[in-house]
């Protein structure tokens, strides 16, 4: 918000990387500023440009697999396993500072990719959720693991698991969509 606000107020269109903001309050303020100043504000989500994910979206939204019943998205990584405060890489600093990354680093850092992938491929909305968010890496003060159970707006069920504490995990983004007539998965 702090970086985008002066540009928005000058009427400059913006392409922004995630996380959008660290809090819902800041996101709501940002939306009001964008609407008031009538600018284009785009949030990047690089995975939706992958040709195989675009194909998966076509298959799912065309009805080829029938009514979506189950969706599973996971994104295991291991970049915080064994990290020590004194060994933090510069690239990790914003992620490991709650004031910058927000109350849940893992959801703002890679959870946003999992959420976007679910919405992009299925075009469904989350209507209800239950989450367990925790810190598995002892040296951290931010969350590095999250399990989220979902109910989607077509009454399908889903889950999202994201972690930076998955030893050996490296960019393991996956989505599975199970319908009444078939399934699609991208691994």
Annotate each PLM feature.
Residues 10-12, 37-39, 156:
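A short helix->loop->beta-strand "cap" motif at the edges of active sites that frequently abuts
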Residues 16, 41-43, 72, 186:
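Hydrophobic residues in well-ordered beta-strands that form the structural core
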Residues 90, 109, 113-187:
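Contiguous beta-strand/loop segments that form the cofactor/metal-binding neighborhood of enzyme cores
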Residues 1-33:
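Beta-loop-alpha module in the N-terminal Rossmann-like domain of NAD(P)-dependent dehydrogenases
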Residues 2, 6, 29, 55-58, ...:
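Alpha-helical elements of Rossmann-like donor-binding domains used by nucleotide-donor carbohydrate transfer enzymes
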Residues 48-139:
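Predominantly a Rossmann-like dinucleotide-binding segment in NAD(P)-dependent oxidoreductases
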Residues 18-19, 44-47, 75:
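Short strand-turn motif at the edge of the Rossmann-like AdoMet-binding core
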Residues 29-47, 67-70:
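Rossmann-fold dehydrogenase core element
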């Amino acid at each position: 918000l702090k970086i985008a606000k002066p540009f928005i107020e000058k009427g400059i269109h913006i392409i922004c990387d995630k996380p959008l903001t660290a809090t819902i309050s800041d996101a709501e303020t940002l939306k009001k500023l964008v609407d008031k100043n009538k600018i284009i504000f785009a949030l990047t989500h690089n995975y939706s440009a992958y040709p195989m994910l675009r194909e998966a979206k076509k298959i799912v939204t065309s009805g080829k697999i029938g009514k979506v019943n189950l969706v599973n998205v996971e994104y295991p990584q291991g970049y915080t396993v064994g990290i020590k405060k004194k060994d933090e890489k510069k690239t990790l600093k914003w992620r490991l500072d709650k004031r910058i990354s927000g109350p849940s680093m893992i959801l703002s850092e890679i959870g946003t990719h999992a959420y976007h992938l679910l919405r992009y491929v299925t075009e469904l909305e989350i209507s209800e959720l239950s989450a367990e968010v925790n810190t598995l890496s002892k040296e951290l003060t931010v969350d590095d693991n999250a399990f989220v159970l979902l109910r989607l707006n077509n009454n399908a069920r889903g889950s999202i698991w994201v972690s930076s504490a998955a030893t050996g995990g490296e960019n393991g983004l996956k989505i599975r969509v199970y319908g009444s007539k078939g399934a699609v998965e991208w691994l």
